[in-house]
Structures are given as structure tokens and as C-alpha cells.
Amino acid sequence: IQYMKNFTEDQKYQIIQLDPKRINKNLFIIETALSDGEPRDTTFYCTKGDPGTSSMYEPLRQNEEVFKVKDVINVPVITLKHFFDVFPWDKVSYIEQLKVDAQSADFDIIRGCGDYLSERIVYLDVEISTSNQYKHYENPQEFHNYIVNSGFEVISLGGNCSYYNKRYSNIKDTINYKFLN
């Protein structure tokens, strides 16, 4: 990983360099997809040029350049619950911000958090709708209701939505939260 893109307040992308010395100490790269259900392998559709539209679900609009499939591969899948089950909670008692933008797999990933969603996540940013983009329909209202019923309150709604966990209302303002588009 060379860099991550962070959407700043002035609406420009800022490149954050990742220190290679931190890999395997503070940063672990796990080459797997996330979803719900049991661990398995699944099909992954890699789009041409990687414009951010690759997905576990086949694109509907492959006539558009950003949805042209370059390759179809099999990838391993786990849930965030599986990951959080071995997370060092004794060192990090909560996750300040969880950002999910997984091209129509977002609801699957959030459901795959299990109780960790309501117990350990302070801020949540998700892409709640990819309507007419993939051969998989995420119901935005059902997705939103699931998050709210998990103890979250809305910060902003739209295609990308932000929420905060009411369980952490006493510390939410001490966290340097930024909406990550």
C-alpha cells in the first residue's frame, strides 16, 4: 500500500503516506473480502483501471467505462466479527470510525459485525445505496433501519451516510471525526 486517500474539510484529497515500518506492527494487510455468513470463497469482479467499482457483485452497466470488468477472480471471505473476535480489545477498547464503501456489499459487511457494531464502533460511514449498479439490491431503508436499531443516530443521509453510536455519546465529541467520502 502506497497511500490512502482522506477526504478533508476543504474537499480536496490529501495523500497520507503509510510508513512501511508500521506494517505488521500497527498495520496488518489481510487479503480477504468482507461479508456476512460463514467463511468461504466468492467471485470478485475486478473493473478496468480500478476506478473504485470492483465488487463481489456483477456490475449491471458494463457498457459504461467505470463498470467494464477486466477480470473475475475468487477471493476468500470472512466477517468483521471473525476479525473482531481476535482483535486486541485490551489495547484498543473501541473503534473510533468504521468506513465501509464496498459496492453493494456494505449491508452484508455491517450485518457481519455481529454485536461489535453496537458495542465497539463509535462512528460509522457507509454507502447505503448503489441502486442500478450491481446485480444485487441493497434496500436502503432496511439498511438504515438496521443501523438505527443497532443504537446509532444519524449525522447525515444520502448515498453515503454517517452515524454515531449513542452508547458513546459521552466521548463522541473528543474524537477527531471526519466524514470519509
How should each PLM-predicted stretch be described?
Residues 1-181:
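Phosphate/nucleotide-binding beta-alpha loop and adjacent structural elements of enzyme active sites
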